[in-house]
């Protein structure tokens, strides 16, 4: 009687979609109110003046103006602010 061993099933073959994180508007760019500035996991960048933080830590503009990135504070954190024009 001819026999052939059954082929095993692979445990690979899955992958998640990329989340498109990162800086969407860079320093010096002029943006409108409500525009997303940074998409991130956690608070790599912190909200400064005229910027708010969503529940998934996305930073967005609350007024129109120019984007400004600056390091300040005791922990040398990076803050994102909007300078009104």
Swiss-Prot record:
For this chain's UniProt record, which GO biological process terms are given? translation
Where is the region Disordered? 1-25
Q: List the disulfide bonds.
A: none
Is Ligase there in the keyword field?
Answer: no
Keywords from UniProt, A to Z, are: Ribonucleoprotein, Ribosomal protein
Cross-referenced InterPro entries, in alphabetical order?
A: Ribosomal_bL27, Ribosomal_bL27_CS
Q: Where does it sit, as one GO cellular component term?
A: cytosolic large ribosomal subunit
Which PROSITE patterns is this protein grouped with? RIBOSOMAL_L27
Determine if Ribosomal protein is one of this entry's keywords.
yes
Recorded GO MF terms: structural constituent of ribosome
Q: Which PANTHER family match?
A: LARGE RIBOSOMAL SUBUNIT PROTEIN BL27M, RIBOSOMAL PROTEIN L27
What family is this? Answer: Belongs to the bacterial ribosomal protein bL27 family.
Q: Please identify the protein, giving its name as recorded.
A: Large ribosomal subunit protein bL27
Q: Give the organism, scientific name.
A: Buchnera aphidicola subsp. Baizongia pistaciae (strain Bp)
């Amino acid at each position: 009687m001819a026999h052939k061993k059954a082929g095993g099933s692979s445990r690979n073959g899955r992958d998640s979609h990329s989340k498109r994180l990162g800086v969407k508007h860079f320093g010096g760019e002029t943006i409108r109110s409500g525009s997303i500035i940074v998409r991130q996991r956690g608070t790599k960048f912190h909200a400064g003046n005229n910027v708010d933080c969503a529940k998934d830590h996305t930073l967005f503009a609350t007024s129109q103006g120019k984007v400004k990135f600056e390091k300040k504070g005791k922990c040398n954190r990076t803050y994102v602010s909007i300078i009104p024009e």
